[in-house]
Swiss-Prot record:
<dbReference type="InterPro" id="IPR022973">
    <property type="entry name" value="Ribosomal_uL10_bac"/>
</dbReference>
<keyword id="KW-0687">Ribonucleoprotein</keyword>
<dbReference type="InterPro" id="IPR002363">
    <property type="entry name" value="Ribosomal_uL10_CS_bac"/>
</dbReference>
<dbReference type="GO" id="GO:0003735">
    <property type="term" value="F:structural constituent of ribosome"/>
</dbReference>
<keyword id="KW-0689">Ribosomal protein</keyword>
<dbReference type="InterPro" id="IPR001790">
    <property type="entry name" value="Ribosomal_uL10"/>
</dbReference>
<comment type="subunit">
    <text>Part of the ribosomal stalk of the 50S ribosomal subunit. The N-terminus interacts with L11 and the large rRNA to form the base of the stalk. The C-terminus forms an elongated spine to which L12 dimers bind in a sequential fashion forming a multimeric L10(L12)X complex.</text>
</comment>
<keyword id="KW-0699">rRNA-binding</keyword>
<dbReference type="Pfam" id="PF00466">
    <property type="entry name" value="Ribosomal_L10"/>
</dbReference>
<keyword id="KW-0694">RNA-binding</keyword>
<dbReference type="InterPro" id="IPR047865">
    <property type="entry name" value="Ribosomal_uL10_bac_type"/>
</dbReference>
<dbReference type="GO" id="GO:0070180">
    <property type="term" value="F:large ribosomal subunit rRNA binding"/>
</dbReference>
<dbReference type="InterPro" id="IPR043141">
    <property type="entry name" value="Ribosomal_uL10-like_sf"/>
</dbReference>
<dbReference type="GO" id="GO:0006412">
    <property type="term" value="P:translation"/>
</dbReference>
<dbReference type="GO" id="GO:0015934">
    <property type="term" value="C:large ribosomal subunit"/>
</dbReference>
<comment type="similarity">
    <text>Belongs to the universal ribosomal protein uL10 family.</text>
</comment>
<protein>
    <recommendedName>
        <fullName>Large ribosomal subunit protein uL10</fullName>
    </recommendedName>
</protein>
Length: 165
């Protein structure tokens, strides 16, 4: 489908606006994946706060110019599906990783987080980032565990002191 200049400018403006507020971006190749599967992926993405769009590579290069996602430029080869995580940095990576397990033809190319290019082989680094709630829960568990251990050591020291006296 041919796009006129206004359509191209509108696409670049829309995706650029999304990129400004995004926490991370993941690029994938969806050749060979059925429309039904892609519809399921898009639905799951909307629920997870992930903006997804298939955009021409030349337009994507304009979109990422001057953003933390500029490191992705070299991955814009062939059909490109880009996903921006809007609420949690690992949301798009987690979504694409799970989808790729079930769909062999879906290939994650790379991701970008805080200006760093993350190759597809290391996408787990981004996908396994804990959510804010998970991080708080882990921190609280660690703090609780540390204070309980300290209490046990203190009680043991008191007991030892009484036995020595």
């Amino acid at each position: 489908m041919a796009l006129n200049l206004q359509d191209k400018q509108a696409i670049v403006a829309e995706v650029s606006e999304v990129a400004k507020g995004a926490l991370s971006a993941v690029v994938a190749d969806s050749r060979g994946v059925t429309v039904d599967k892609m519809t399921e992926l898009r639905k799951a993405g909307r629920e997870a706060g992930v903006y997804m769009r298939v955009v021409r590579n030349t337009l994507l290069r304009r979109v990422v110019e001057g953003t933390p996602f500029e490191c992705l430029k070299d991955t814009f080869v062939g059909p490109t599906l880009i996903a921006y995580s809007m609420e949690h940095p690992g949301a798009a990576a987690r979504l694409f990783k799970e989808f790729a397990k079930a769909n062999a033809k879906f290939e994650v190319k790379a991701a970008a987080f805080e200006g760093e290019l993350i190759p597809a082989s290391q996408i787990d680094r981004l996908a396994t980032l804990p959510t804010y709630e998970e991080a708080i829960a882990r921190l609280m568990a660690t703090m609780k565990e540390a204070s309980a251990g300290k209490l046990v050591r203190t009680l043991a020291a008191v007991r030892d002191a009484k036995e020595a006296a």
